[in-house]
Amino acid sequence: MNIKPGDRWCWFFDRQHDRLMLDLANGMVFRSRFPSKMLTPDAFDASSFCVDDAASYYHFAERCQASGLDTAQCAELVLNALVAQRFLKPIMPKSWYFTPQPGRYVPEMGELVGVQLLDTPDWGRLLVIAPGASASLCLLAQPSLALAGKRLMLGEAIKVMHDRLLPLSTHPETLSDDTTLACAG
């Protein structure tokens, strides 16, 4: 699924599906993973796909290439990243799922980061959407991740304190889905 942003793309809210949608103007419509209760008021008004959206799309798409996801999964992750960046309400950190890490690390927007699950040797891979002063909004950048009785799916949002994140470039580990993180180091 190779898609490229176009000037005819349009955001709209679909009440029947309770999801923000992106009309890709070629007969395809993307349905985001976020329900109305997670969206800002702007999400309920139709709006054009703007230049900033396109710039973020290319930034996230470039970074997603190192994720190990297939083309369709990358497209889904990138489009959900745009929704989260532009329309998601603030969420509280849920860092208690992850092991604290040594050092002071502050990720960049679009960076792939790793988190180690608390009390297990399993690791997860996240895409940073909006880095903050002490925590970052991230999306799950792997097919799924089991978190203490709950399962996160590809593209789901979670906010994580920076002291739980590690750059993938310095910490290769095995993910819970038996996929090895592609890292240098």
From Swiss-Prot:
The keyword Cell division applies. Belongs to the ZapC family. HAMAP family: ZapC. It holds the Pfam family ZapC_N. Keywords: Cell cycle, Cell division, Cytoplasm, Septation. Interacts directly with FtsZ. One of its GO terms (cellular component) is cytoplasm. The gene is zapC. InterPro entries: ZapC (IPR009809), ZapC_C (IPR048372), ZapC_N (IPR048373). The lineage of its organism: Bacteria, Pseudomonadati, Pseudomonadota, Gammaproteobacteria, Enterobacterales. Contributes to the efficiency of the cell division process by stabilizing the polymeric form of the cell division protein FtsZ. Acts by promoting interactions between FtsZ protofilaments and suppressing the GTPase activity of FtsZ. GO terms for biological process: division septum assembly; FtsZ-dependent cytokinesis. This is Cell division protein ZapC. It is found in: Cytoplasm. It comes from the Bacteria.
